[in-house]
Design a protein with these regions (language model features):
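Beta->alpha turn/N-cap motifs
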Residues: 38-42, 52-71, 174-181
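Pocket-lining segment of extracytoplasmic ligand-binding domains
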Residues: 111, 119-215
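Hydrophobic residues within well-ordered alpha-helices
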Residues: 49-50, 105, 165-166
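Bilobed "Venus flytrap"/periplasmic-binding protein-like clamshell domains
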Residues: 4-30, 62, 87-160
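Extracytoplasmic/secreted proteins, especially bacterial periplasmic and envelope-associated proteins
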Residues: 18, 22, 44, 123, ...
Length: 276
């Protein structure tokens, strides 16, 4: 019996078990053995991928950059969600704060999410530095390191930032675009109470990562099976809704450029080392 393709994923939410049971069953029902291993944090998952204990890792952008750099660029991004493309960070403030641009943050308190979150901390800090240069010293940075190891997947630190803004403990803060859309669509804050004043350029988020050494047939089989999923099939539709995508897409050179800004930021902030 052939060995299964072993995929790693971080269990940031109980729904992850359901998502991966559906994917595993889909593969197995179609004649391809697949199993998954759940991790409590991305640092452990990176270690297992680099040491060959798993074949493929469902990685955040931070985990991808670390894997790529620590493998001496001998890793490959295979596949991603359509929603991982053109992801953005948003700066939020109270509507009546008088803050209309990043320049208005001088002398203010600005909140960042978990230190290992690309969308809520790593990239926002870089954007602040780009916009303010030396004047960043005039901004009081407040960090909310909730759920470290999950790379911002839970979104908890972003809601900590929002609550602090609501309760006047912060003047402004950074969150990911998906959290901001959720706030607006679900009416999580009174209408007109908070607003955005800065939206970053688009960048890429998660991807399925494999080392170059993984058999090409295994890579192709995995990608082909994922792409063959029919989003109109009820069980697949359920999985995709839970995972937050409309379709899987192959990661090309164009998408890889969407990790350049994060790679630069992580190097500048000394975040490449994998501290597990």
């Amino acid at each position: 019996m052939k060995k299964p393709i072993v995929v790693g994923s971080v269990a940031y939410d109980p729904k992850i078990v359901t998502i991966w049971d559906i994917i595993r069953d889909y593969f197995n029902d179609n004649g391809v053995r697949l199993d998954y291993v759940l991790f409590s944090n991305y640092e452990a998952q990176i270690e297992y991928l680099l040491s060959g204990k798993i074949d493929i890792a469902w990685n955040t952008n931070v985990a991808w950059v670390r894997t790529y750099e620590l493998s001496n660029h001998k890793a490959q991004a295979l596949l991603m969600r359509d929603t991982d493309i053109d992801f953005k960070s948003v700066f939020i403030t109270k509507a009546k704060s008088g803050i209309k641009s990043v320049q208005d943050l001088k002398g203010k308190k600005f909140g960042l999410g978990s230190a290992d979150s690309a969308q809520a901390a790593i990239l926002p800090l870089k954007y602040l530095q780009n916009e303010l240069d030396e004047s960043i010293k005039d901004v009081e940075i407040v960090k909310f390191n909730s759920d470290l190891g999950k790379h911002g997947d839970t979104g908890r630190s972003e809601f900590d930032v929002l609550e602090a803004i609501k309760n006047d403990k912060l003047d402004a803060g950074a969150i990911g675009i998906s959290t901001w859309v959720r706030v607006l669509e679900e009416g999580l804050f009174p209408a007109g109470e908070i607003e955005s004043f800065y939206t970053s350029e688009g960048y890429c988020h998660c991807n399925f990562t494999a080392l170059n050494s993984l058999d090409e047939k295994v890579k192709k089989t995995f990608v082909d099976m994922m792409l063959s999923q029919d989003p109109n099939e009820p069980i697949i539709k359920k999985m995709m809704q839970m995972e937050g995508l409309n379709k899987w897409v192959i990661t090309t050179e164009k998408e890889l450029k969407g990790y350049d800004v994060l790679t630069q930021a992580m190097k500048e902030q000394n975040l490449i080392k994998n501290n597990w």
